[in-house]
Regions:
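Catalytic-loop motifs flanking and including active-site residues across diverse enzymes
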Residues: 48, 78, 129, 184, ...
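Structural motif
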Residues: 48-51, 98-112, 180-181
Length: 277
């Protein structure tokens, strides 16, 4: 579940005291303050956007960073992460553009950003809209550095962009399924191949890890499973090693992983990189 859906279900989660594991969003309201029933595994949007901001500034010397966002809770959560990361550097968002959810009406948002001539644009939206934004930017002769966060969907964004994707950045909350040598990656790929999937991708890996965490907590809950026992088992994960990815929870910390990885689209693939060039 993403940001708007999570925001809608959290009151019911709290009312019924149902454990909510691994929401597919980095929104801050699921993390702070800590909620007894909620356990986030993927890194927050702040961690992702900070990674992008830090690299734009440290590697490229960029300070004029714009945002293009979906006009809803998801976009607002991503924008808040960028604002916070820039504020830590004494900077502000240089320009902002928006588009309406479930549309491809990106031109007005693009024009709002173009007039300010930013060095880079961090995008928080759906893959079709973000793809349309980048392609329209190129059509208009506008070539800043583009970056998306992981929620965009790497595989779908690359397919949407075609050749226009080369050079764009995507932050990831899971290691690269094709490049990493971690044990979890080897196990994941072997298990996926047993189901006829030869080229698994990031989202599938995230679901795989989420399932591993849940199964471990169920096993640690003992013979007589209750919600409180399950929550206690989740809270008891201290540096728990899942094939090289170490998950941590506590009563006051509902963020299992903080890992963020940087990739760049090159020749139709999202390749891991250490620095922006």
């Amino acid at each position: 579940m993403g940001t708007p859906t999570s925001k809608a279900v959290v009151p019911e989660v709290n009312r019924a005291k149902i454990p909510y594991i691994g929401p597919f969003t980095g929104a801050e309201f699921l993390r702070n303050p800590a909620n007894k029933n909620i356990f986030n595994i993927r890194a927050s949007y702040f961690s992702e956007t900070k990674k992008l901001v830090d690299h734009f500034i440290n590697d490229l010397g960029y300070k004029k960073i714009a945002v293009f966002i979906q006009d809803d809770g998801y976009g607002a959560a991503g924008k808040a992460g960028v604002q916070r990361a820039l504020r830590m550097r004494g900077l502000k968002i240089h320009a902002e553009g928006r588009y309406k959810r479930n549309t491809l009406d990106v031109e007005q948002g693009l024009n709002s950003i173009m007039t300010k001539k930013p060095d880079a644009v961090i995008m928080v939206g759906a893959y079709k809209a973000c793809g349309a934004f980048i392609k329209m930017s190129h059509d208009k002769g506008f070539y800043p550095k583009f970056a998306n966060i992981s929620f965009v969907g790497t595989k779908k964004l690359i397919a949407e962009l075609g050749d226009a994707g080369d050079g764009s950045y995507i932050s990831q909350v899971m290691p690269n399924p094709d490049e990493s040598t971690l044990k979890i990656i080897k196990d994941f790929k072997a298990d996926m191949q047993s189901y006829g999937v030869d080229n698994p991708y990031y989202t599938q890996l995230e679901g795989y890890l989420n399932a591993m965490v849940i199964v471990d907590a169920l096993e640690q809950s003992g013979q007589y499973l209750t919600r409180d026992r399950f929550i206690g088992a989740m809270e008891g994960m201290k540096n728990k090693d899942f094939g090289g990815l170490k998950v941590n929870f506590s009563k006051s910390d509902r963020q299992g992983l903080d890992n963020v990885y940087l990739t760049q689209i090159q020749d139709g693939k999202a390749l891991p990189i250490q620095t922006m060039k």
